[in-house]
Design a protein with these regions (language model features):
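Hydrophobic helix-and-loop "lid/oligomerization" segment in the mid-to-C-terminal part
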Residues: 1-98, 103-135
Length: 135
C-alpha cells in the first residue's frame, strides 16, 4: 500500500493549486461530451507550478459525468504537450497522430511547437466535430 499511496494518492500543493486554476478554465463542447483546457504558462505561474505538475489532470477531467473525451493542452518552455483521454465511445489516437503524436485508442498525446494553444484547440474541436454524435 505504501508504494501505491506514493504513486497514486499523493499530490503536492502545487498540483492542487494548478488543478484548481485549470478547472476555472475548463471548457465543455458537444453537449458536454468533450471537455478540455489550455494550461498556459500564466495559469501555471499563478499556481506556483509548472507543466510537470499536470499528471493525472486529463484522467480527472474525463471522470466528469457525461464527458466522453477530455484533453489538456499544456504550455511548456517552447512547445505544447497535448494529452487525450476517452471513455471508449470515441477513439482519439488519430487526433494525436494529426499533430505528429500517437498512443492508444483511448489514451494518446502529442507535442506541438508550430501552433498556439488556441490554434491547437481549434484543430482538436474541428476533428472531434466529425466524430461526436450530439443527438
Amino acid at each position: 500500500y505504501d508504494v501505491y499511496e506514493k504513486l497514486y494518492e499523493r499530490r503536492s500543493l502545487y498540483q492542487i493549486k494548478l488543478l484548481s486554476e485549470s478547472i476555472k478554465e475548463l471548457k465543455f463542447n458537444f453537449n458536454k461530451q468533450v471537455c478540455g483546457v489550455i494550461i498556459s504558462k500564466e495559469i501555471q505561474n499563478k499556481a506556483g507550478a509548472n507543466y510537470e505538475h499536470v499528471e493525472g489532470f486529463t484522467d480527472f477531467f474525463r471522470s466528469i459525468e457525461g464527458v466522453q473525451v477530455a484533453y489538456c493542452i499544456i504550455e511548456q518552455n517552447y512547445s505544447y504537450r497535448i494529452n487525450f483521454r476517452s471513455r471508449g465511445k470515441y477513439i482519439i489516437n488519430d487526433i494525436a497522430k494529426s499533430f505528429g503524436g500517437g498512443g492508444h485508442k483511448l489514451a494518446a498525446g502529442a507535442s506541438v511547437d508550430n501552433l498556439s494553444g488556441s490554434e491547437i484547440e481549434d484543430k482538436i474541436l474541428r476533428i472531434l466535430k466529425g466524430k461526436i454524435n450530439v443527438n
